[in-house]
């Protein structure tokens, strides 16, 4: 049975970045359910916008995005729609429009060969015994059993590692649904849509490489029905759909209290969305995935006496920032307050008409 210093479950932005940064310094194994290349297999449904905080992470790491990761067009504003109040406002935003699946595969491609990576793999079971973490996974057609001193859960909203560490922990979840359509709008745009009769989260749209993507986060029970209802309403705001090219869905976490941020225990650690590190006001998670990765890397390499305690303390600033997003979300999803803010015209950039 092979033994490693660190076993990473999941190679989204958080897991890939951690594997890359620990390479050559610790013996690392990493498991991921995505294929190594191509469009077959799992791909994460995502609007695919890289926020300024995530861009800063790449600046710190000295990385630049390859052209095949960047999507067309680049949009500098968000059209914010309040359906009930029939209000539309434009706010400046500095996002980079990306192809999320290509971005994830590029992040994986940066992992050095010294890391043992298993693509298209499935983690079947984890447990702790004799001060080691045991992992059973299936890859290349057969089951393997390894042990590790440290276990890292970078496995997203449905984190197996989080469920194992905190079996009684409950966090609000939504089903994120997206549909792709051929782009029909004369001017591509990015939008954020609020309709409290549909969801107490929000919906979105983005133009990307000749497609119009429409999606949102909805209650788990009847999300599809609510999604369809909102689509019908959006014709009043000049949204054009047509025939569906493809549909996607996944679970997304929605932290709503301080206790929703969990960092791990017993030499197991959670990073990115697995830890609840996702913005409640925008559902943006890549920047927090990268920030939590940097924090955990520092803790693992410095080897303080109590690693889990050190990681918990080191993420305090990040958790406070995310708690601020919870407060912001409550403001944005409060109909009266949102209506007042939008009617005030603060930060709104009106579009010139011919």
From Swiss-Prot:
Entry superkingdom: Bacteria
GO molecular function annotations of the record: FAD binding; flavin adenine dinucleotide binding
Protein induction: Induced by the two-component regulatory system CreC/CreB and by the signal autoinducer AI-2.
InterPro entries from the UniProt entry: FAD-bd, FAD/NAD-bd_sf, Geranylgeranyl_reductase
GO biological process, one term: bacteriocin immunity
Xref: Gene3D superfamilies: FAD/NAD(P)-binding domain
PANTHER family for the chain: CONDITIONED MEDIUM FACTOR RECEPTOR 1 (PTHR42685:SF22), GERANYLGERANYL DIPHOSPHATE REDUCTASE (PTHR42685)
Additional remarks: Disruption of this gene leads to greater resistance to hydroxylamine and hypersensitivity to ofloxacin, 5,7-dichloro-8-hydroxyquinaldine (a lipophilic chelator) and 18-crown-6 ether (an ionophore).
Family per record: Belongs to the CbrA family.
Protein name (Swiss-Prot/TrEMBL): Protein CbrA
Gene, per the UniProt record: cbrA
